[in-house]
Regions:
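Flexible, acidic/Gly-rich N-terminal and inter-domain linker regions that tether
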Residues: 1-78
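Conserved Radical SAM active-site core
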Residues: 47-131
């Protein structure tokens, strides 16, 4: 089987998942808070996330465990391709990413922009994509 066969199967699986998940965007219950907000209409719930992802930054991250970031293992030092999203529903008191999670510091990105971040990280040698 060729590479295109697998790419097509993955794309079909993604489209199927999006079809199944799309009703939740207008009656959000994706997290345990079940806020039922209509994100499609531009409203936001506890997580402050609307109809688009908000990204704070996208970079190669070397602060993860060596098995993820590649440090010290078989000569791989590519880093973990990390995309930091803004907004969170947990509201942990000792959150290490308070500015991103609680203050929602980030920029709305389209699906295409998010995909381009991932491709750029891959081109930079990321060993994985860490969301």
């Amino acid at each position: 089987m060729n590479k295109n066969f697998f790419v097509e199967r993955k794309l079909e699986a993604v489209e199927k998942a999006l079809t199944r998940l799309s009703p939740f965007a207008s009656n959000c219950c994706l997290c345990p808070r079940h806020c039922r907000v209509d994100r499609i209409s531009g409203h936001t719930g506890i997580c402050q996330t609307g109809d688009q992802a908000r990204v704070s930054t996208s970079l190669l991250h070397f602060g993860e465990e060596p098995v993820l970031s590649g440090q010290g293992g078989a000569g791989k030092v590519g880093g973990s391709g990390t995309i930091f999203f803004a907004g969170c529903n947990l509201k942990c008191l000792f959150c290490q990413n308070y500015q991103l999670s609680w203050l929602n510091q980030g920029h709305p990105v389209s699906d295409e922009q998010l995909a381009s971040f991932m491709l750029k990280l891959q081109a930079q040698g990321a060993l994985n994509i860490n969301l």
